[in-house]
Regions:
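Amphipathic alpha-helical packing segments from all-alpha helical-bundle domains
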Residues: 75, 104, 121-147, 154-157, ...
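Hydrophobic alpha-helical segments that form the core
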Residues: 151-172, 181-191
Length: 196
């Protein structure tokens, strides 16, 4: 096989893998993992069922690939070079990053919510995302201490629960949910809570 043929073959393989991942993400998010068939994924991705299984041995492997490809987008990143900024600015930046993820990747957020409702997948999701959650908790805790939180560990979980609630309501009715108003109110609410 010529170098050009190898390059084209790699590109085609990457393109078909990407199509499978995109189709599966949408179907798993909208229908649920168990309710989605490999035939539906093949049809949506416009590939053969055999091609799906040449990339992934099982439907579970497709989901694991989605998690591997997308896990770092579940948690917005903190800017590590923002030591000079005050805690409120950092929190606003974090909330904005998380809300951008929610707006740009609602299917990914919906899939995460669905998986968290399924005990077996919740364990897998937690295991896969463990390092990211630990980074999130460490950085969020430090930010909360800076911001004046008296119970930063509990506040980390409280913020997580608030984010889950916002995410669930937004993906259920994105056109009706006042996301920008919630963002502004959430920052003010958290800071007034810590100041008391």
């Amino acid at each position: 096989m010529s170098p050009r043929s190898k390059t084209l073959s790699k590109q085609m393989k990457a393109k078909s893998r990407s199509a499978i991942i995109s189709a599966a993400l949408e179907l798993f998010a909208k229908k649920g993992f168990s309710a989605t068939t490999a035939d539906e994924i093949a049809k949506k991705a416009k590939v053969s069922k055999g091609l799906i299984f040449s990339h992934f041995l099982t439907k579970e492997n497709i989901l694991l690939a989605i998690l591997d490809d997308e896990i770092d987008r579940f948690l917005p990143k903190f800017d590590q070079n923002d030591e000079a900024r005050d805690p409120k600015e950092k929190l606003v930046s974090f909330i904005n990053g998380w809300l951008r993820l929610l707006e740009k990747e609602p299917l990914l957020v919906l899939l995460s919510l669905r998986l968290n409702l399924d005990e077996s997948w919740r364990k897998i999701l937690r295991k896969k995302g463990k390092q990211y959650v630990e980074i999130y908790l460490k950085r969020m805790r430090a930010l909360l201490v800076q911001a004046g939180s008296k119970k930063p560990d509990l506040d980390c979980y409280l913020i997580g629960v608030l984010f889950d609630g916002v995410a669930a309501n937004y993906v259920a009715a994105p056109k009706l949910f006042p996301l920008n108003d919630i963002k502004n109110y959430l920052v003010e609410l958290l800071f007034s809570y810590w100041q008391n």
